[in-house]
Amino acid sequence: MKGAEPLAELRLRATFLERPNRFVARVRLEDGREVPVHVASSGRMKELLVPGAPVIVTLQGDASAQPTRPFGGRKTAGRLLMVRTGSTWVSVDTSLPGKLFHQAVVAGSCAPFAGYTEVRPEYRYGGSRIDFLLTAPDLPPCLVEVKSVTSVLPDADGARVARFPDAPTARGARHLDELAGAVREGYRAAVCFITQRDDAQAFGPWDEIDPFFGETLRKVARAGVEIRAFVTHVTPEGAVLGGELPVRLAR
């Protein structure tokens, strides 16, 4: 899959200090200033956001001055975009997976969805807004939910497995049930787990964190919902959607 998505117009390297709440992180810029930045992901990311971790942030306005303008409804200086763990850069921008998926489908470079010519984001179906509706004259309409994945853990066999969710998500399970209902009505439906890093070898639900989501994922897979996963190649300069990952649903 081709097409890079720039992560920000102005990117600055910094050091992660702390996360006082789910949506704010404090970082130290290279010039020594400590500033709060918005964290778009409400996931815990405890294995990523550790004091001293290198990060990439984007600031509002003039980065040479102390920024004070509000961002995301909070007094934050900008956004946290990426964190490095070991030698791997991980995007924590939750809007990025949807952008990359959208671009890939439009470009015809996302093989599982080749042939779809129209992409409608935020499609209302049932009681939910589904991320995408894909349509084409000779193909069944396809509803797609895109999930952002940042955690990768070793499995029992040593394989590095991307895991979702890293916090309980009743909303995520509800979306899965909506997709299963769509299959019963003649739609094609899929959930795509976009791993925002390139060191995963497979994907599987994180049952220890949210067993209900894991069981729901297995249930909808049996009902005909496609479970797909992809890696993302991330560098400080941008990100490219990569190939598919094997999916491990067995407990």
UniProtKB/Swiss-Prot annotation:
Which Pfam families does the annotation name?
A: SfsA (PF03749), SfsA_N (PF17746)
Gene3D superfamilies assigned to the protein according to its UniProt record, in alphabetical order:
2.40.50.580, 3.40.1350.60
Q: Which domain of life is it from?
A: Bacteria
Here the disulfide bonds are none
Tell me the GO molecular function terms: DNA binding
By sequence similarity, the record places it as follows:
Belongs to the SfsA family.
Q: What is this protein called?
A: Sugar fermentation stimulation protein homolog
Q: What is the lineage of its organism?
A: Bacteria, Bacillati, Bacillota, Clostridia, Eubacteriales
